[in-house]
A protein has these predicted regions:
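N-terminal core-binding DNA-recognition domain of tyrosine recombinases/integrases
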Residues: 1, 11-117
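Short, amphipathic alpha-helical interface elements at domain boundaries
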Residues: 21, 25-44, 50-61, 158-299, ...
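Short, charged/polar micro-motifs that form catalytic or ligand-binding hotspots
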Residues: 65-73, 225-232, 273-281, 343, ...
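Short amphipathic alpha-helical interaction segments
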Residues: 71-81, 277-293, 401-430
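Amphipathic alpha-helical protein-interaction segments
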Residues: 74-195, 283-292, 297-300, 413
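Accessory beta->alpha helical hairpin/"wing" motif in late/C-terminal subdomains of nucleic-acid enzymes
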Residues: 93-109, 285-289, 294, 298-351, ...
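Long, helix-rich, hydrophobic modules that act as membrane-proximal anchors or helical bundle/coiled-coil regulators
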Residues: 362-365, 373-398, 406-418, 422, ...
Length: 489
């Protein structure tokens, strides 16, 4: 499964803290950085701009982060250590504000953090209730204990409710008799007359308990056979070639992107190494995002270089890893390819599309699920129709625009999945001769650039299906989500 980017960096940071005898700062740093990931617009833990420090220490933490006992006292110190860690190890994103300016901002906020954390008038509803729960001896992260505590609190007497909710009631008097529902740190307040009639599907999405689904039984190939196919993934081989090219260190722009000339050089290097065309487009959309998420490459001291986890990839491709480890690595890369991270520095025009992109993100997963359920090749139009029928997307004015958006998004992700060995595509190869000259020329250019024509063009007879490796990967993910996904004996 995919590793959390913030968690990966925290693991490196904890080693750094231990070496400096500052391990006590690990817990408050974890709360702060996890809070920033969950409650701010920036999900890249190495990217810090002016105002980010103030927002984290004096807005997000006081309003939303429950203090287990170390946050108010050591939060500012922990964040200072983290910023110095980024600077000393060269991990600070090139577009970040310079460290001296960030530390000055932190110094101005440090003395204000503890009073802000103690000011109950600033606490949000979830923090107010979780703090009371913590005081009653229920640990953060104890989901069963939280459910029991909230159930008891919902039935407690009015005086106790008022004591806990006093600061909130001045702003939200309707909470006096509210019924609270909780799941994984998210809290919602319902009217008492709603709780028995409200269907689970009417709860906020974050509070809905996923109901296990039962899928068809599948027959899986032997693990050793699947591992052989996984190690042949073109995406993994391209990632290894990219890391080798980046090993000396390649300059990046302020946005953390490769220079245009280097992008071309890298694509040429990968093409030669993999004996398969690899254009700048393929490199930028299918290889770099996965290689970066998997730490095969990383930005250090303003340069793209080989990453700390490159050794894992080398072992996978060289036969030095066990079949189980090869498949685990392949699956993590598969998840990264299907849900690529957005670059932290967004062009303002592209940033306007982010709400639409967020709506489109789950669609590739629905498409793969449709293929898993079908257990056979699906014609392109049928696949899109099934995906469209399941979509909750509300960003389009009509089905025609919605279909175009979905088709474009799904084509890009399925193309990445094919290069990784998860899906296969077939089409009527005799039909291109009947296409107009311009379309045929476009198809030829796409092939020369390492892109299958069907990613960009409407080709007759196009069908998509999961490979045995893709079936295994989908089954692993469905099972991990708590679904019933049996295997044929």
């Amino acid at each position: 499964m995919r590793r959390d980017r913030t968690r990966q960096l925290l693991d490196r940071f904890e080693v750094w803290l231990s070496d400096k005898g500052l391990s006590e700062l690990a817990e408050p740093a974890q709360f702060l950085l996890t809070g920033r990931r969950n409650y701010s617009t920036s999900r890249e833990p190495t990217y810090w701009r002016s105002g980010d420090v103030h927002a984290l220490l004096l807005v997000i933490a006081p309003e939303r982060l429950t203090d287990p006992g170390t946050l108010a006292e050591h939060g500012a110190e922990a964040l200072e250590a983290f910023l110095r860690f980024l600077d000393e190890t060269g991990r600070l994103h090139p577009a970040s504000t310079k460290i001296p300016a960030l530390l000055k901002e932190l110094a101005r906020a440090a003395d204000k953090m503890a009073p802000a954390m103690a000011d109950r008038s600033r606490w949000g509803m979830a923090k107010t209730l979780y703090t009371a729960m913590l005081a009653d001896g229920v640990a953060l992260g104890d989901e069963s204990g939280a459910q029991n505590w909230f159930a008891a609190f919902n039935e407690t007497d009015e005086q106790h409710r008022h004591t806990v909710l006093a600061a909130l009631l001045t702003r939200q008097p309707e909470l006096r008799d509210a019924y609270f529902v909780v799941r994984d740190g998210i809290v919602a307040a319902l009217r008492r007359d709603q709780r028995d009639t409200l269907a689970p599907a009417q709860l906020p999405t974050q509070l809905q308990v996923p109901q296990p689904q039962t899928y068809r039984a599948v027959r899986l190939r032997p693990e050793t056979e699947l591992a052989v196919h996984a190690a042949r993934s073109l995406t993994l081989h391209r990632m290894a070639a990219l890391a080798e090219w980046a090993r000396p260190g390649r300059a990046v722009t302020k946005k953390g992107e490769l220079l245009d000339r280097d992008l071309t050089t890298a694509a040429e290097f990968i093409t030669e190494h993999c004996v398969t065309p690899s254009s700048e487009l393929v490199l930028g959309t299918e290889v770099l995002p996965v290689a970066y998420a998997m730490e095969c490459v990383e930005i250090r001291y303003g340069k793209l270089t080989a990453g700390e986890r490159l050794g894992e990839l080398t072992a996978v491709l060289s036969g030095g890893a066990s079949p189980a480890d090869i498949l685990s690595y392949w699956l993590e890369a598969f998840d990264c390819a299907m849900r690529p991270d957005r670059t932290p520095v967004r062009d303002r025009h592209l940033a306007k599309l982010d709400p639409i992109i967020e709506e489109l993100e789950p669609i590739s997963a629905w498409t793969l699920e449709a293929l898993y359920i079908a257990a056979r090749p699906l014609a392109w139009d049928d696949l899109i129709s099934e995906t469209l029928a399941d979509s909750q997307f509300e960003g389009a004015d009509d089905d025609k625009l919605l279909g175009l958006l979905i088709s474009t998004s799904v084509r890009a992700r399925l193309h990445a999945a094919m290069r990784h060995g998860a899906v296969s595509a077939t089409w009527d190869t005799s039909m291109p001769a009947a296409l107009d000259e311009q379309t045929r020329a476009t198809a030829q250019r796409l092939v020369e650039q390492g892109t299958e024509p069907w990613q960009m063009l409407e080709l007759p007879g196009l069908t998509i299906e999961l490979t045995p490796l893709g079936t295994w990967g989908m089954r692993e993910n469905l099972h991990a989500e708590g679904n019933i996904a049996p295997v044929k004996k």
